[in-house]
Regions:
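Short aromatic-glycine motifs in intrinsically disordered, low-complexity regions
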Residues: 194-202
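Pseudouridine synthases involved in rRNA/tRNA modification
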Residues: 1-36, 81, 201-208, 215-218, ...
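RNA pseudouridine synthases
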Residues: 1-182, 186-188, 289-293
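Short small-residue beta-strand/loop micro-motif enriched in glycine and branched aliphatics
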Residues: 99-102, 195-196, 221
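Short beta-strand micro-motifs in enzyme catalytic cores
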Residues: 91, 168, 221-223, 265-267
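Short, surface-exposed secondary-structure edge patches
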Residues: 50-54, 224, 261
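Beta-strand scaffold of nucleotide-dependent catalytic cores
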Residues: 181-186, 197-198, 209, 223-225, ...
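Catalytic strand-loop-helix junctions within cyclic-nucleotide turnover domains
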Residues: 176, 217-221
Length: 296
């Protein structure tokens, strides 16, 4: 994907080498190495510069990204996409349940990556798939994908630093009590399986989930959940640990009476735009299969 990013150098940034300035903006060392290999990728006031050269307050720095390769082994497939937002740097998708993020052995042609490969192929744009918040196949809702190497690196760092704020909605069995709280229960891989996780206070990694009851209906609760950590299956295990498992969860509560997938939805997401710094906020409504469980 091609992108020209422009920066106005401030007094505080006066005297920095270009590579120092870009590292402060969140570009990785690998990003800088790739940009160096691109022809005339750094311009200052319209003149070609090298990464080691210094900047002066008032300079206009342009970073010209030109990616010509596409993700290998991701065949383009025409699959509808619910696009919530798109600009030159990111695309935000409301992913349906049942769609994997990446192709895999049994899901080679039905992933989000396949759909986006097709979407950009139609526009004659090379596309490398860089998903910044990965959802389980049967979890619906918001996910953000970067469109070039710089936004990808910056968003990845923001995610690691817990600067991407997410709210999930879940439908669980029973009336949740207390109605709000924080679950601090470390998680580890369950012995004998590569998929399942479990609460393990001795060997597990720190996992913290904040929850709040929204409504209760028909013997089920709709719960809002926010994560401080992003462990595999964290919400699913923590709610089961609390005594209120997600309905339809084939791994941790295999009761398919009301739903045939875990009732979990990535509902809301907020973060600073990786390039402009503008605060971004997105919401995806509760999907019908979850809403129907709560109807009288």
């Amino acid at each position: 994907m091609n992108r020209t990013i422009e920066y106005l150098i401030t007094e505080k940034e006066d005297g920095l080498r270009i590579e120092q300035f870009l590292r402060r903006k969140g570009y990785s060392g690998q990003n800088l190495a790739e940009i160096k290999r691109m022809p005339k990728s750094i311009l200052v006031n319209g003149v070609h510069y090298y990464m080691r050269q210094t900047l002066t307050a008032g300079d206009i720095l342009k970073v010209i990204i030109c990616e010509t390769k596409c993700s290998e082994k991701i065949p383009p497939v025409e699959i509808p996409l619910d696009i919530i937002y798109e600009d030159e740097d990111i695309i935000v998708i409301n992913k349906p349940a049942g769609m994997p993020i990446h192709p895999s052995m049994n899901n080679y042609y039905n992933s989000l990556a396949n759909a986006l490969a097709w979407y950009y192929q139609k526009q004659d744009k090379p596309f490398i798939f860089r998903c910044c918040n990965r959802l389980d196949r049967d979890t619906s809702g918001l996910t953000v994908v970067s469109k070039h190497l710089a936004s990808g690196s910056i968003l990845s760092t923001m995610t690691k630093n817990r600067e991407v704020h997410r709210e999930y909605l879940a439908v669980v069995k029973g009336r949740v009590t207390p109605s709000s709280g924080t679950i601090c229960a470390p998680l580890a891989r369950k012995e004998g399986t590569i998929i399942e996780r479990m609460v393990d206070f001795e060997h597990g990694e720190e996992a913290i989930t904040h929850y709040k009851l929204i409504i209760e209906a028909n013997g089920h609760s709709l719960v809002s959940l926010k994560l401080e950590t992003g462990r595999t299956h964290q919400i699913r295990i923590h709610m089961k640990y609390l005594g209120f498992p997600l309905i339809g969860d084939y791994l941790y509560n295999p009761d398919m009476e009301h739903m045939t997938r875990q009732a979990l939805h990535s509902h809301h997401m907020e973060f600073a735009h990786p390039i402009t710094g503008e605060w971004m906020s997105f919401t995806a409504p509760l999907p019908a299969d979850m809403a129907n469980v709560l109807k009288d």
